[in-house]
């Protein structure tokens, strides 16, 4: 079982049941100073967070990862070069690379390719798997054919996909991503934070549900969904 709370832009607060039956709390791309965020970094002071995953080093994804790691004691998981830089900030950082399965405490993860840019290490997406649910956060990415392979190999139940265009996939490209990944649930992200990434999540929902078997849930910042 998974509980996913949308924190605006590309940030999520996720609870997964671990392989040992214990819940693990995970933050994904935690830019909590985004203009849509319902929470502030200070709201996490003293909270239990196990892992913070960062898909790449752009400020709207790396966000408040260091501050949150210091406040919660969470380990930051990122591509190797970025993790090395973060460790210099005094946080516990786990470095990995694309395609290398990670066995973490109670959960598994693997970084996936992403078509984007990044100054420190390659841009990535990430699949995080608990006892009975796998969540794919695509990071910032354009559409690419190996999303089909991600679907076949890692079978994500939930896909968190950017739809805002300009820097990432737009609605049409994200629809094709759903066709390739074949998740049971898709949640749009990375839209309407700035004028450049205006998009209609309801149009995405309409297209996906009309042409695939995937359900789309459009979350407002602060809302959450439970899966299954």
UniProtKB/Swiss-Prot annotation:
Protein name: UPF0173 metal-dependent hydrolase Tpen_1493
The species this protein was found in: Thermofilum pendens (strain DSM 2475 / Hrk 5)
Signal peptide (from-to): none
Similarity comment text for this entry: Belongs to the UPF0173 family.
Keyword line: Hydrolase
Top-rank lineage group of the source organism: Archaea
PANTHER family (UniProt xref): UPF0173 METAL-DEPENDENT HYDROLASE MJ1163, UPF0173 METAL-DEPENDENT HYDROLASE MJ1163-RELATED
UniProt GO molecular function: hydrolase activity
UniProt cross-references to Pfam families, sorted A to Z: Lactamase_B_2
Gene3D superfamilies in alphabetical order: Ribonuclease Z/Hydroxyacylglutathione hydrolase-like (3.60.15.10)
């Amino acid at each position: 079982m998974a509980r996913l709370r949308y924190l605006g832009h590309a940030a999520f607060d996720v609870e997964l049941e671990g392989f040992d039956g214990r819940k693990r709390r995970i933050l994904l791309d935690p830019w909590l100073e985004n203009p849509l965020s319902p929470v502030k970094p200070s709201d996490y002071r003293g909270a239990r967070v196990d892992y913070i995953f960062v898909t790449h080093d752009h400020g709207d994804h790396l966000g408040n990862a260091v501050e949150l790691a210091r406040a919660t004691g969470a380990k930051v998981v990122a591509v190797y070069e970025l993790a090395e830089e973060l460790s210099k900030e005094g946080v516990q950082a786990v470095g990995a690379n694309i395609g290398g399965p990670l066995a973490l405490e109670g959960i598994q993860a693997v970084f996936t390719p992403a078509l984007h840019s990044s100054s420190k290490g390659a841009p990535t997406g990430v699949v995080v798997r608990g006892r009975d649910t796998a969540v794919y956060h695509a990071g910032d990415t354009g559409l690419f054919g190996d999303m089909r392979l991600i679907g076949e190999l890692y079978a994500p139940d939930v896909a968190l996909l950017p739809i805002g265009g300009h820097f990432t996939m737009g609605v049409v490209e994200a629809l094709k991503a759903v066709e390739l990944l074949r998740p049971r649930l898709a949640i749009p992200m990375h839209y309407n934070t700035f004028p450049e990434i205006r998009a209609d999540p309801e149009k995405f929902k309409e297209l996906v549900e009309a042409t695939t078997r995937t359900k789309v849930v459009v979350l407002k910042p602060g809302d959450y969904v439970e899966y299954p």
